[in-house]
UniProtKB/Swiss-Prot annotation:
One GO CC term, this protein: chloroplast
Gene3D superfamilies registered for this protein in UniProt: Glycogen Phosphorylase B (3.40.50.2000)
Protein name: Granule-bound starch synthase 1, chloroplastic/amyloplastic
Tissue expression pattern: Synthesized in a number of different organs, but most abundantly in tubers.
Cross-referenced PANTHER family: GRANULE-BOUND STARCH SYNTHASE 1, CHLOROPLASTIC/AMYLOPLASTIC, GRANULE-BOUND STARCH SYNTHASE 1, CHLOROPLASTIC_AMYLOPLASTIC
Native organism taxonomy: Eukaryota, Viridiplantae, Streptophyta, Embryophyta, Tracheophyta
């Protein structure tokens, strides 16, 4: 049992110092404090006329604080388990560009189902319809300015979903969360991303202390300070640094611990070394950030590396599959120059689960015929015909159909797949590709219909219904990733009895067993600036091998093996619990097996 004291509704004690990182970005270099107005729609930048009203409100708040007329302290008794705070730049379905958003969408409810108290903290990029203003704000000192952030909250599937409201998040990607989280377009970052994600880290350290949340029947009041933070990817790498540099020296979060999870080591947060003083960290942290590489971006030579610091300053380092954990310490190529540091700290890999509520062939709202393992062989030919008709291919249930769903970029190997199609269509086969990404790749797949009108189709759109139709209607799902920390497409495919054909990398090795639940083609080259002919040959050879099993008893057995697996978050949640208990945060207790509280009401959430 844990006892905490719930106190206030507005925090004014968090004047955490951090220098402005981009003095000219986004008009942040105004004279004097930069203020915001608080509206039902969140924080917006103030015009000059609004500032008088803001001063009046500020005086009123100070008067209430001085007279002690705020909400009185209350003794709150909480349930058992752990207090877990997941922090990330994305959380599905509210904001998602890939696996990071899926993990923060799916793992926290699974941990809550085991009896733990769970919060996620992420930016409020949009006016999420089911996230409500808590009326709690904190003031964070950034350089010589005081920035106000406000917290919005939604309680879903046993998880406190907390969103950090600030103009740097809300005004940047208004209405287009999915495509503009990190930059105005693919491959281009915002110039003030260091400032944005520093603010996220500081706000995440405040949220467990100041938010008085009472949505759960088992928990109420603030989370307190005996918590385990789970920081995700480079955007949250400053969290353990600020914890050690600012909070713990003041006696705050004395027993808190941080687990740092790497979702994709290719994205590290490398910036000019001259930016380090702007992070407002003591010089003793400089060595954790110090990094030299051979690239000229963002500057040539010495840099700071956020992910390196997150790895070195956290209490535990994890990633999203056991095989990927082996890969990132195998050498410079797959460890992307951080392999030496990870070998020193150690790393554990826990495979991801998947959302078995959204992706369920028994209840899927996007397919006309529902099925399970007992009816799959009758249902899939009909679903294939529906898919063929939808994309304009000749309707023939006897033609093997291969699907591809994913981002059109080098990591996912979409360019290698397209290069192999001219050889693949020599077989009796149809191919359907769905994805968005780099414009040159989108044009490539859209041109497939012209080149192979009876054999291939490419759809360069974000199309959720079609993704479900491909997953259900295809016979095989191709996942030719150059590297893949975990991967979700192969999990979705197996859940629907669609046999995956995968590159032998990362989580694809852990989840797809050769000859039992799919086909392995071997590891592809990780260089993204060219297509290796050996990789094209590997795809062609492995696809031919898979097609050789079509309409055989061997393929039927594979289909049933795929569908017999438990691909939910239950198993991964047990492993995460064990790892987090090993952090030995005061008051932590094991959880119990349980079911998720309720499905996520996605109709109340704007489409990411």
């Amino acid at each position: 049992m844990a006892t905490v004291i719930a106190a206030h509704f507005v925090s004014r004690s968090s004047h955490l110092s951090i220098h402005a990182l981009e003095t000219k970005a986004n008009n942040l270099s105004h004279t004097g404090p930069w203020t915001q107005t608080i509206t039902p729609n969140g924080l917006r930048s103030l015009n000059t006329m609004d500032k008088l009203q803001m001063k009046t409100q500020s005086k009123a708040v100070k008067k209430v604080s001085a007279t002690g007329n705020g909400r009185p302290a209350a003794k709150i008794i909480c349930g058992h388990g752990m207090n877990l705070i997941f922090v990330g730049a994305e959380v599905g379905p509210w904001s998602k560009t890939g696996g990071l958003g899926d993990v923060l969408g799916g793992l926290p409810p699974a941990m809550a189902a085991r009896g733990h108290r769970v919060m996620t903290v992420s930016p409020r990029y949009d006016q999420y319809k089911d996230a409500w203003d808590t009326s709690v704000s904190v003031e964070i000192k950034i350089g010589d300015r005081i920035e106000t952030v406000r917290f919005f909250h939604s309680y879903k599937r046993g998880v406190d979903r907390v969103f950090v409201d600030h103009p740097m998040f809300l005004e940047k990607v208004w209405g287009k969360t999915g495509s503009k989280i990190y930059g105005p377009r693919a491959g281009l970052d915002y110039q003030d991303n260091q400032l944005r994600f520093s603010l996220l880290c500081l706000a995440a350290l405040e949220a467990p202390r100041v938010l008085n949340l009472n949505s759960s029947k088992n928990f109420s009041g603030p989370y307190g300070e005996e918590v385990a933070f789970i920081a995700n990817d480079w955007h949250t790498a400053l969290l353990p640094c600020y914890l050690k540099a600012i909070y713990q020296p003041m006696g705050i979060y004395k027993h808190a611990k941080v687990a740092f999870c790497i979702h994709n080591i290719a994205y590290q947060g490398r910036f000019a070394f001259s930016d380090f003083p702007r992070l407002n960290l003591p010089d003793k942290f400089k060595s954790s950030f110090d990094f030299i590489d051979g690239y000229e971006k963002p500057v040539k030579g010495r840099k700071i590396n956020w992910m390196k610091a997150g790895i070195l300053e956290s209490d535990r380092v994890l990633t999203v599959s056991p095989y990927y954990a082996q890969e990132v310490i195998s050498g410079v190529e797959r460890g992307v120059e951080l392999d030496n540091f990870i070998r020193k700290t150690g790393i554990a890999g826990i495979i991801n689960g998947m959302d078995v509520q959204e992706w369920n062939p028994v209840t899927d709202k996007y397919i006309d015929i529902h099925y399970d393992a007992t009816t799959v062989m009758d249902a899939k030919p009909l679903l294939k015909e529906a898919l063929q008709a939808e994309v304009g291919l000749p309707v023939d249930r006897n033609v093997p159909l291969i699907g591809f769903i994913g981002r059109l970029e080098e990591q996912k190997g979409s360019d290698i797949f397209v290069a192999a199609i001219s050889q693949l269509v020599e077989h009796n086969v149809q191919i359907v590709i769905l994805g968005t990404g780099k414009k040159k790749f989108e044009k490539q797949i859209e041109h497939l219909e012209v080149l192979y009108p009876d054999k291939a189709r490419g759809v360069a759109k974000f199309n959720v219904p079609l993704a479900h139709m491909i997953t259900a209607g295809a016979d095989f799902m191709l996942v030719p990733s150059r590297f893949e920390p975990c991967g979700l497409i192969q999990l979705h495919a197996m859940r629907y009895g669609t046999v995956p054909i995968v590159a032998s990398t990362g989580g694809l090795v852990d989840t797809v067993k050769e000859g039992y639940t799919g086909f392995q083609m071997g590891a592809l080259h990780v260089e993204c600036d060219k297509i290796d002919s050996a990789d094209v040959a590997a795809i062609v050879k492995t696809v031919a091998r898979a097609l050789g099993t079509y309409a055989t008893a061997a393929l039927r057995e594979m289909i049933l093996n795929c569908m017999a697996q438990d691909l939910s978050w239950k198993g991964p949640a047990r492993m995460w619990e064990k790892m987090l208990l090993d952090l030995e945060v005061t008051g932590s207790e094991p959880g119990t097996e349980g079911e998720e509280i309720a499905p996520l009401a996605k109709e109340n959430v704007p489409t990411p």
